[in-house]
Curated annotation (Swiss-Prot):
SMART domains: ANK (SM00248), ArfGap (SM00105), PH (SM00233). This is Arf-GAP with coiled-coil, ANK repeat and PH domain-containing protein 3. The gene is ACAP3. Keywords: ANK repeat, GTPase activation, Metal-binding, Repeat, Zinc, Zinc-finger. A zinc finger (C4-type) spans 418-441. Residues 268-363 form the PH domain. The keyword Zinc-finger applies. GO terms for cellular component: cytoplasm; growth cone. Residues 634-653 have a biased composition (Acidic residues). InterPro entries: ACAP1/2/3-like (IPR045258), ACAP3_BAR (IPR042695), AH/BAR_dom_sf (IPR027267), Ankyrin_rpt (IPR002110), Ankyrin_rpt-contain_sf (IPR036770), ARFGAP/RecO (IPR037278), ArfGAP_dom (IPR001164), ArfGAP_dom_sf (IPR038508). The lineage of its organism: Eukaryota, Metazoa, Chordata, Craniata, Vertebrata. Residues 375-400, 633-653 are annotated as: Disordered. Residues 382-392 have a biased composition (Polar residues). It comes from Homo sapiens.
Length: 834
């Protein structure tokens, strides 16, 4: 519909009617085009969904073709059909893209640009037309006797009429252009869409026409395939009947004699089979899983598609033993540095086979995997016997002070070579024996069991400062003086690095299990004259000698009774008990007193590892216990007091109570007590080697254990040594006091931290119905009170979170991280002050 420009100038009723008709037509065509665009969008979206689904279908056909690789007929057929269908899908995609461009985008552009511009011009035209009507009314209403108003109304009417005519001409022009463009846009878009449809079907026909000969050939092959399938079915039915008849007479009992393992299997799988595994949850459920030993690892999976779960990452760091103390039969346990795994076989023969397979794999891993291959794995979790914590890396760096663990431990006398075979550069250690070992000897030690030797790597495991210092206090030379004292007399020859594994294993078992080379104690009931121990001052290996001063520690030349020397330790500890407490402001921080503690290290310090500091001059002067042993020293004034309290040998009642027999004639348990009290690690190691029970309670001394004596002696390192050798941290004396009670009574913060770390029960009550916290509060020891309260808070948080773990032991909950760091910082602090 075209609007005449002349009618526009006249603004006649015909013009207005035409304008209204055109506007109505534009509104209707806009609605129709919007609907068509939406329908086209829906069609395109549905087409894209169809294309996406078709592509998935084609992908499924290709997967089926890959699955049928063994059958060339099916594989080739599916592959060709998948290629053809993929082309058809591509043609569909082209069709829908063309529909989107030709219909949706083109018509939508016409509606949004041209129709919108028409609407905006219409709004301006309507507004000007209203202004013209208003100007005409005002001009008609202007009074004759007011020329000023008449002139103003006339001028406004003239301007409004000019504006109306100008805008009306533009509006009519836009209407005519829109009417012409509407026809072109609609026809052009539909023509393009139909061309796309034509191209789609032509391409599809051409594609399928080329495939038609192959489809006819395949149809002929299918006819023959039906015949062949019928023949094959009859043959399979005949075989099925024959096999079913034969199995009726077969015995299905399982032949356990066929169970075997092969360490050198080409596939790398030493042994595999089903085992029951006890879960680590609170219910301890048992689940059947498929286990295998491969690549020096113990792994399992539930289904073939499941990823392998690694139980033991490195078999060199684990051990295996049968378990007879649980209710279920045929069980065995695999112990790794981080956890233990309880497994159950289906029979005794299978259990033996699995145990032997694990042991053989461990030996094979030692032979085939040198220690250097794993040297980069320095941050492995420590073994359970040492209760390693998450902050072990930080504390290790603090304890080593720039040296590596390997260099520091190897610098001890005798540690430059293996303590059993003499091979240079040993990188493994037995932490409860205090010796360094080569990789082959460490494997033999591991086979002895953790009750005999606890093996740890100097490069693969993390080392707590207290354990590192313990290793530096002993060493191969000191330990071999005990375990190889009568080596030459026994007629045995110590193996060398080139000796066979059998020779090394026999030697190690004779040395540590049979203990054939220990110096035997004389069998005489008593000596004619009582022997005494000479107590003299000596320096620790790592201290530097300095000239003595008037107030320095002096050499005690008089021969003191052994008991006087030992009992003086407790006297000195009581004398130098720390009296500094937290200030109220310091309680706001767990570590605020560290600097004050380090700055205040002075004469009140007693021993190098007691947690009470070191000597004022930086040296670690000690008293010799027996021959070449290490105990703490006393000042000149304290030595006099000790001599005065002990008295002469003939009249000293305390010495008579302890006995004046030679150390070699002491009961091993009593020797362990005295050595622990005197902080003499070599003597304590000798006592344990001679059969001393680590938890032996001395009935004549209120049932105290060696661990309690170590607390009274004030040595954190001796406590660590006893704990590594199986000391019970919760065993009480006749007064109901555990080691934690005694450490709290004496204000030994470092030992309190060590016992809390090792799972000491802080709720235990003594005969006076006091727990360690009550004792610490009564003694006004702010640091121990703070530690015990933090321990209780951590325990309560662990119980609230239902974290697994034995009562009193430190669990791995993140809520305890700060407390565990605090514990380790305390221990590290007291070790560094020495």
């Amino acid at each position: 519909m075209t609007v005449e420009f002349e009618e526009c100038v006249k603004d006649s009723p015909r013009f207005r009617a035409t304008i209204d008709e055109v506007e109505t037509d534009v509104v209707e065509i806009e609605a129709k085009l919007d609907k068509l665009v939406k329908l086209c969008s829906g069609m395109v979206e549905a087409g894209k969904a169809y294309v996406s689904t078709s592509r998935l279908f084609v992908s499924g056909v290709r997967d089926l073709s890959q699955q049928c690789q063994g059958d060339t007929v099916i594989s080739e057929c599916l592959q060709r059909f998948a290629d053809s269908l993929q082309e058809v899908v591509n043609y569909h995609m082209i069709l829908f893209d063309q529909a989107q461009r030709s219909v949706r985008q083109q018509l939508q552009s016409f509606v949004k640009e041209d129709v919108r511009k028409f609407k905006e011009t219409k709004k301006q035209f309507d507004k000007v037309r209203e202004d013209l009507e208003l100007s005409l009314v005002r001009n008609a209403q202007a009074p004759r006797h007011r020329p000023h108003e008449v002139e103003e109304a006339t001028g406004a009417l003239t301007l409004t009429r000019k504006c109306f005519r100008h805008l009306a001409l533009d509006y009519v022009l836009q209407i005519n252009v829109l009417q012409a463009k509407k026809k072109f846009e609609i026809l052009d878009s539909m023509l393009s869409f139909m061309h796309a449809q034509s191209s789609f079907f032509q391409q599809g026909y051409s594609l399928l026409h080329q495939l038609d000969p192959y489809m006819k050939k395949l149809a002929a092959e299918l006819d023959q395939l039906v015949i062949d399938s019928a023949v094959e079915k009859r043959e399979m039915e005949r075989k099925h009947a024959a096999i079913q008849q034969r199995t009726l007479l077969q015995d299905f009992s399982y032949d356990e004699s066929k169970v075997e393992f092969d360490v050198d299997a080409p596939s790398g799988v030493v042994m595999e089979g089903y085992l029951f595994k006890r879960a680590s949850n609170a219910f301890k459920t048992w689940n059947r899983r498929w286990f295998s030993i491969q690549n020096s690892q113990l792994v399992y999976q539930k289904k073939l598609k499941d990823a392998l779960t690694v139980v033991v990452d490195d078999l060199r760091l684990c051990s295996v033993k049968p378990c007879e103390d649980i209710e279920r039969r045929f069980c065995f346990e695999v112990l790794s540095p981080t956890k233990s795994c309880m497994l159950q076989a289906d029979s005794e023969k299978l259990r033996q086979a699995w145990v032997q397979a694990v042991q053989a794999s461990i030996a094979s891993a030692y032979r085939e995997s040198p220690d250097s291959c794993y040297s980069e794995r320095l941050d492995r979790t420590a073994s359970p016997s040492t209760s390693s914590i998450d902050s072990a890396t930080d504390t290790r760096e603090r304890g080593v002070k720039g040296e590596s663990v390997l260099q520091r431990v190897q610098s001890v006398a005798g540690n430059s070579q293996c303590g059993d075979c003499g091979q240079p550069d040993p990188r493994w250690a037995s932490i409860n024996l205090g010796v360094l070992l080569c990789i082959e000897c460490s494997g033999i030690h591991r086979s002895l069991g953790v009750h005999c030797s606890k093996v740890r790597s100097l490069t693969l495991d993390s080392w707590e400062p207290e354990l590192l210092k313990l290793m530096c206090e002993l060493g191969n030379s000191a330990v071999n003086q005990i375990y190889e004292a009568q080596c030459e007399g026994a007629g045995s020859r110590k193996p060398t690095a080139s000796s066979s594994r059998q020779d090394k294993e026999a030697w190690i078992k004779d040395k540590y299990v049979e203990k054939k080379f220990l110096r035997k104690a004389p069998m005489a009931p008593a000596l004619e004259a009582p022997r005494r121990w000479r107590v003299q001052k000596c320096l620790r290996p790592h201290s530097s000698p300095r000239a003595p001063t008037a107030r320095r520690k002096v050499r005690l030349e008089p021969v003191l009774p052994c008991v006087a020397a030992l009992s003086s330790v407790g006297t000195l500890d009581r004398k130098f008990r720390r009296d500094s407490l937290f200030c109220p402001d310091e309680l706001d921080s767990l570590f605020s007193y560290f600097d004050a503690g380090a700055a205040g290290a002075g004469p009140r310090s007693l021993s190098s590892d007691s947690g009470l500091g070191g000597s004022s001059d930086g040296s670690s002067d000690v008293l010799a216990f027996g021959s070449g042993s290490v105990v703490d020293s006393v000042t000149e004034e304290e030595g006099a007091e000790s001599e005065e309290s002990s008295g002469e040998a003939d009249g000293d009642t305390e010495a008579e109570a302890w006995g004046l027999a030679d150390v070699r004639e002491l009961h091993p348990g009593l020797l362990a007590h005295r050595a622990a009290r005197a902080r003499d690690l070599p003597a304590l190691a000798a006592a344990l080697a001679h059969g001393a029970e680590v938890n032996w309670a001395d009935a004549e001394d209120e049932g105290k254990t060696p661990l309690v004596q170590a607390v009274l002696g004030g040595s954190l390192i001796v406590c660590e040594f006893l704990l590594q050798n199986g000391a019970d941290v919760n065993q009480r004396d006749s007064r109901g006091r555990a080691p934690l009670h005694h450490a709290t009574l004496l204000g030994r913060t470092g030992q309190v931290c060590l016992f809390l770390k090792r799972g000491a029960d802080q709720h235990a009550l003594d005969q006076e119905q006091r727990d360690p916290l009550a004792i610490a509060v009564q003694a006004a020891n702010a640091d121990i009170v703070t530690l015990l309260r933090l321990a209780r808070m951590a325990e309560e948080m662990r119980e609230a979170e239902a974290a697994p773990g034995p009562p009193g032991a430190l669990a791995g909950s993140p809520t305890e991280l700060q407390f565990r760091r605090c514990i380790q910082e305390f221990i590290s602090l007291h070790l560094e002050e020495s």
